[in-house]
Swiss-Prot record:
<dbReference type="InterPro" id="IPR001185">
    <property type="entry name" value="MS_channel"/>
</dbReference>
<comment type="subunit">
    <text>Homopentamer.</text>
</comment>
<keyword id="KW-0472">Membrane</keyword>
<protein>
    <recommendedName>
        <fullName>Large-conductance mechanosensitive channel 1</fullName>
    </recommendedName>
</protein>
<keyword id="KW-1133">Transmembrane helix</keyword>
<keyword id="KW-0407">Ion channel</keyword>
<dbReference type="GO" id="GO:0005886">
    <property type="term" value="C:plasma membrane"/>
</dbReference>
<dbReference type="Pfam" id="PF01741">
    <property type="entry name" value="MscL"/>
</dbReference>
<feature type="transmembrane region" description="Helical">
    <location>
        <begin position="81"/>
        <end position="101"/>
    </location>
</feature>
<feature type="transmembrane region" description="Helical">
    <location>
        <begin position="30"/>
        <end position="50"/>
    </location>
</feature>
<feature type="transmembrane region" description="Helical">
    <location>
        <begin position="8"/>
        <end position="28"/>
    </location>
</feature>
<dbReference type="GO" id="GO:0008381">
    <property type="term" value="F:mechanosensitive monoatomic ion channel activity"/>
</dbReference>
<comment type="similarity">
    <text>Belongs to the MscL family.</text>
</comment>
<keyword id="KW-0813">Transport</keyword>
<keyword id="KW-1003">Cell membrane</keyword>
<keyword id="KW-0406">Ion transport</keyword>
<keyword id="KW-0997">Cell inner membrane</keyword>
Amino acid sequence: MLKEFQEFISKGNVMDLAVGVIIGAAFGKIVDSLVNDIIMPIIGAIFGGLDFNNYFVGLSSAVNATSLADARKQGAVLAYGSFITVALNFVILAFIIFLMVKAVNNLRKRLEREKPAAAAPPPADIALLTQIRDLLARK
């Protein structure tokens, strides 16, 4: 049973999937940093220096805090700023993955075009004439 498991794990598809998941997780952190540390501060500066992560609406009258963390302690909040940030992360990640898939597909198409096409077999009459010629040449 252990040997079967080892064979299963060592197959190319499983290893490729594992590498893809690990790289995907690391890439997700890069996109999070890009959005949180570069894009959102620029957008915040354009809209008055505000941090989108602190945009929220209190869902009860008891919520009167100015920061999201304090507001969550006071009661239920609708944290739409955090949602905007996460949605932007998703859009950027989806676009980058789209570009990567498109590049791989273009590379595959280019490699298929560069492969020489297999020579079509000659028509039956040409093959027969070639055989006759070869037989006559041997005599």
